[in-house]
Amino acid sequence: MTQNATSETLGFQAEVKQLLHLMIHSLYSNKEIFLRELVSNASDACDKLRFEAIDQPELLAGDSELAIRVSYDKAARTITIADNGIGLSREEAIANLGTIARSGTREFFSQLTGDKQKDAQLIGQFGVGFYSSFIVADRVSVLSRRAGSDEAIRWESDGQGEFSIASAEKATRGTDVVLHLRADEDEFLNGWKLREVLRRYSDHISLPILMRKEEWDADKDEQVTRDEWETVNQANALWTRSKSEISDEQYREFYKTVSHGFDEPLAWTHNRVEGRSEYTQLLYVPRQAPFDLWDRDARRGVKLYVKRVFIMDDAEQLLPAYLRFVRGVIDSADLPLNVSREILQESRDVRAIREGSAKRILSLLEDLAENRKDDYAVFWGEFGQVLKEGVGEDPSNQERIAKLLRFASTHAGDASQTTSLQDYLGRLKEGQDKIYYVTADSYSAASNSPHLEIFRKKGIEVLLLWDRVDEWMLSHLREFEGKSLVSVAKGGLDLADLADEEEKKKQTEVAESFKPLIERLQTALGEQVKEVRVTLRLVDSPACVVVGQNDLSPHLLRMLKAAGQEVPEVKPVLEINPEHALIARIRDVSDADFGAWAQLLLDQALLAEGAQIADPAAFVKRLNALLLKV
């Protein structure tokens, strides 16, 4: 670092250097977004000034007409984006223009692949903002003066690793960003081109975006710039317009502004709500999940305005957590202009907005599920696990959310999660009054579970679940439309409804005839198991393990252990298949080998369940010894 009384040269934060390099190489095909980002920043600066001026009206003194001015100089090869907003202090310039102060930075960089198209999407999700200047500029200068201060600063950088910051003179508050264009970026030194980009990307900005008028000079045979300024955008907030006045393309472009991305939204809803709370909402469901969807500290929520005055960017209190992927704007007519995050947590109006917005998004998803099934499949693949959280978090909408859930199923025969609970009910067997499911660590483990054998034999559908959130969700979703949801891995599973009279009679007889073997197995396995018993739920497997009806499932126990949680000891119940050849073999084994066979039976049942056995080396040694005797 070098410095004197008024200037210093500092190094960019390492992550900024990396982002600049990636951005210049990955976003070049989307280079026009630099203008969108800089105009958006200028608009935000004006919004922040308007907000601070609520308590300090003197900040607007002498210059209350907020606007953004875009100009270019062909001779100097520069583009300038100027605003009369809040401005930057020296400390703010260093913090905002030299570092990335947000969570999820490390996770963002870890997900980059080297594929320009995929990385461009990730960079868009992360938010490039000011740094997009360097896509088209080889040097950027920022002249800024904070509202309420007489001191100004000049920030400069070539984007190569360092930036300088020095004291400067500026007659008015606000910020001027000057881009010194690269040699091959002459297309932006054109008034028509700049207007076209501004109208495409920033027409919805509520502030006027001004450019100098241009006229054709016949004598000079060229366009000439006049001193008079003209507004090039509509200069009213998109969400305040009537839906009939807004094209789908305008909705899509506005989404790209609020999401800072390049992808198209999957769907949106735009409504004006009147009643106990009056507000306008324009909410979007993205097509792709953000890289930090599971980061607890990630920025989430929608932009909050009050009477068209910007209040905050990430008002997460306006939507329930399970809809944290939603982007957009909510403009309230009832909240106070000086609203804080603390007030948001306690406000009755906010609760009304949150409940109303949740219902709107659920209606939007219901429409997708019913009328745009391919789009809903995309949504489910990206956000299905998050939506499942709503089953427990939003009891008032639980039934609606349950109808939106999608599962893999033995009916489909593959891992695609396309079966709804209503689909399942439509395929119930005669006399079936339960919805059966199995949970596991993966689709493969679920679809190959021995617990499915009797259900496959009888043609009864079973839902296959392996997402980490599933066990928690199922603890809140006990029934659907009067039918209980039942795990096929629970020992208390009542299979009587699935058996005919002959099978019930056979089950009673078998249980009696196998009592001696059951007692031998119980003695040999001792405290390792809660119980040993005969079952008719198995067809191809010799044995399986189950847990009590009120015990935690093996799958949930494994997840809790992996998370470092203390878990209660749950002894499994070993169930044996009386018709399997291995069980017949074990009945005749001598006492000398019986203990080894009993342990092998339990270990392979645990492995089939996806559990870890206590001593893998002993298992292999025992298996090899018994194989030599076969």
Curated annotation (Swiss-Prot):
The UniProt annotation puts the region (A) at 1-341
Give one GO term, molecular function aspect: unfolded protein binding
The region called C is annotated at: 559-630
Q: How does it assemble?
A: Homodimer.
Q: Which PROSITE patterns match?
A: HSP90 (PS00298)
Which cysteines are disulphide-bonded?
none
Output the superkingdom of the source species: Bacteria
Read off the InterPro entries from this record.
Answer: HATPase_C_sf, Heat_shock_protein_90_CS, HSP90_C, Hsp90_fam, Hsp90_N, Ribosomal_Su5_D2-typ_SF
What function does this protein fulfil?
Molecular chaperone. Has ATPase activity.
The segment annotated B runs over: 342-558
- Give the primary localization class: cytoplasm
Q: Tell me the protein family, please.
A: Belongs to the heat shock protein 90 family.
One GO CC annotation:
cytoplasm
Note the Pfam families from the entry.
HATPase_c_3 (PF13589), HSP90 (PF00183)
Q: Where in the cell is it found?
A: Cytoplasm
**Upper lineage:** Bacteria, Pseudomonadati, Pseudomonadota, Betaproteobacteria, Burkholderiales
Any idea what this protein is called? Answer: Chaperone protein HtpG
Q: Which UniProt keywords are given for this protein, alphabetically ordered?
A: ATP-binding, Chaperone, Cytoplasm, Nucleotide-binding, Stress response
